[in-house]
Amino acid sequence: MSSFPTVLVIGAGLAGSEAAWQIAQAGVPVRLIEMRPIKHSPAHYSSECAELVCSNSFGALSSDRAAGLLKEELRRLGSIVIRTADSHAVPAGGALAVNRASFSASLTKELSAHPHITIERQEQEHLPDEGQITVLATGPLTSELLAENLRTFTGRSECHFFDAASPIIEGESIDLTLAFRASRYDKGDADYMNCPMDKGQYLAFREALLNAEQAELKEFDKESAKFFEGCLPIEELARRGEDTMRYGPLKPIGLWDPRWGDLNDRDVRRSKRAYAVVQLRKEDLEGRLWNLVGFQTNLKWSEQKRVLKMIPGLHQAEFVRFGVMHRNTFSKPRSYLNQPCSSANDPTSSLLDRSPAQRDIPLQ
């Protein structure tokens, strides 16, 4: 029997799973509350802990980049999330990407086996009574009842934005006579699938995106729809200007198909280089599944099939998951949190962020 009071961690996403593990590793008992599969969010597909809803990439690996340095620090601090990600990594050039299914399944198994962690599958509808040491890590997809309770607790109105996920297709349906494998600037192995476009193909694709039907938002969301600027739907990028996509996720720089000729020949390079390139990243080691990088979208599923098949090499694409958009709830912590992230109303309650700096954050 532990002499420490039990800590309540609400939410078994990335932040909640890490918090529960670190607390338990210190010998403190933890109740980890997760509402799935009793109640699912609009974007989750499984009941596993730390399910990756959007990208399967954790960003740069190299420690000369800020994201890579942060991961190395977490590694040295014994992070279960980073350790599990390393164990389930898939080739992704200079990035740490994972097989999202085996990653979350493995992490769930470790959490379930920890002697100091009890996982309870139920919806937490309100904050616990004052005095209960609590970590709130429910993330941007916090259930409505708990979000309403938090608004009452903080005295702050709800803030929200819209986020989206990218489609995933079967690798065997990619036409390799048009697509090619390469990593940008030839860094590391040829881990990405690349679908090059000439100017005419790019402009036609953009026009199709602009005219495609989108999934309907609820009436109360239409007037206040805001997007997360770090993860904009591809159709929103298309709306922002003719060249926005090709200076963003479709940028062609650093990508060359050897079939085009000698990259060092200036005339060949000028005549053959792509106007834009769509990249796909592996979802598993075998390359059975690939996700379209930067292609989070709110298009209707039928429109996704029609428009995305215009991409050279994807004309026979078989979709295993379509892109979806969902409403994210976030908090403005500066107005009601002390350092480090404890509530001014109840110092025994804390909110966790996935990011290294405290700012306007999802409830995670």
From Swiss-Prot:
InterPro entries: FAD/NAD-bd_sf, MnmG-rel, MnmG_N, TrmFO. GO terms for biological process: tRNA methylation; tRNA wobble uridine modification. SUPFAM superfamilies: FAD/NAD(P)-binding domain. FAD binds at residues 11-16. It holds the Pfam family GIDA. It comes from the Bacteria. Keywords: Cytoplasm, FAD, Flavoprotein, Methyltransferase, NAD, NADP, Transferase, tRNA processing. It is found in: Cytoplasm. Its cofactor is FAD. Its EC number is 2.1.1.74. Coiled coil: none annotated. It is an enzyme of class 2 (transferase). Residues 335-352 have a biased composition (Polar residues). GO terms for cellular component: cytosol. It catalyses: uridine(54) in tRNA + (6R)-5,10-methylene-5,6,7,8-tetrahydrofolate + NADH + H(+) = 5-methyluridine(54) in tRNA + (6S)-5,6,7,8-tetrahydrofolate + NAD(+); uridine(54) in tRNA + (6R)-5,10-methylene-5,6,7,8-tetrahydrofolate + NADPH + H(+) = 5-methyluridine(54) in tRNA + (6S)-5,6,7,8-tetrahydrofolate + NADP(+). NCBIfam families: gid_trmFO, PRK05335.1. PANTHER family: GLUCOSE INHIBITED DIVISION PROTEIN A, METHYLENETETRAHYDROFOLATE--TRNA-(URACIL-5-)-METHYLTRANSFERASE TRMFO. Catalyzes the folate-dependent formation of 5-methyl-uridine at position 54 (M-5-U54) in all tRNAs. Belongs to the MnmG family. TrmFO subfamily. This is Methylenetetrahydrofolate--tRNA-(uracil-5-)-methyltransferase TrmFO. The lineage of its organism: Bacteria, Bacillati, Cyanobacteriota, Cyanophyceae, Synechococcales. The gene is trmFO.
